[in-house]
Amino acid sequence: MVKAIAVLKGDAGVSGVVHFEQEADAAVTTISWNITGFEPNTEHGFHIHEFGDVTNGCTSSGSHFNPFKKTHGSPEDENRHVGDMGNVLADANGVAVGSAKDPLIKIFGPTSILGRTVVVHAGKDDLGRGGNEESLKTGNAGPRPACGVIGIAN
């Protein structure tokens, strides 16, 4: 099993940790998260971006990780970016905790997420259903209050 981690930080009070686990090259990856500092009862876009560059905060992490040149979608869609992880839901205390399994996200191989950046967005991801061109690129999720580079975990 290989494990990876991204420690999310930003300048808006949002912070957290995202864990990735994959048993073998062809296996589904398990993602789990614990993110704090949101407004209560809100949803936030949650993506893997193409670069592990946070020199200018989260904006230098580039676009969603999209090695297969697809349009933006939900994690359940066949036509989606590899980095499309949907939304995280903050509870009444502004904390988002959850997990998911994803067949496209890989720690191993040519489409590895290692060295890329997890970004949590200020707004809800419309999952590519917003009816405009930006929806098909970003899900209209808005600014990037926190992010973290994905690295190998212990």
Swiss-Prot record:
Which InterPro entries does this entry report, sorted A to Z? SOD-like_Cu/Zn_dom_sf, SOD_Cu/Zn_/chaperone, SOD_Cu/Zn_BS, SOD_Cu_Zn_dom
Reaction(s) catalysed by this chain's protein: 2 superoxide + 2 H(+) = H2O2 + O2
Question: Where are the disulfide bridges?
Answer: 58-147
* GO CC annotations, alphabetized: cytosol; mitochondrial intermembrane space; nucleus; superoxide dismutase complex
One biological-process term from Gene Ontology? fungal-type cell wall organization
Where, in this chain's numbering, is substrate bound? Answer: 144
Record keywords, A-Z: Antioxidant, Copper, Cytoplasm, Disulfide bond, Metal-binding, Oxidoreductase, Zinc
Q: Which domain of life is it from?
A: Eukaryota
* S-adenosyl-L-methionine listed as a keyword: no
Any one GO MF term held by the record is: superoxide dismutase activity
Where it sits in the cell: the answer is: Cytoplasm
A Pfam family assignment: Sod_Cu
Q: How is the cofactor bound?
A: Binds 1 copper ion per subunit.
Record-listed Zn(2+) binding positions? 64, 72, 81, 84
Query: Which sites bind Cu cation?
Result: 47, 49, 64, 121
Keyword Oxidoreductase set for record: yes
- Cofactor(s) for this UniProt protein: Cu cation; Zn(2+)
Complex and partners: Homodimer.
- The protein's name is Superoxide dismutase [Cu-Zn]
Q: Which organism is it from?
A: Eremothecium gossypii (strain ATCC 10895 / CBS 109.51 / FGSC 9923 / NRRL Y-1056) (Yeast)
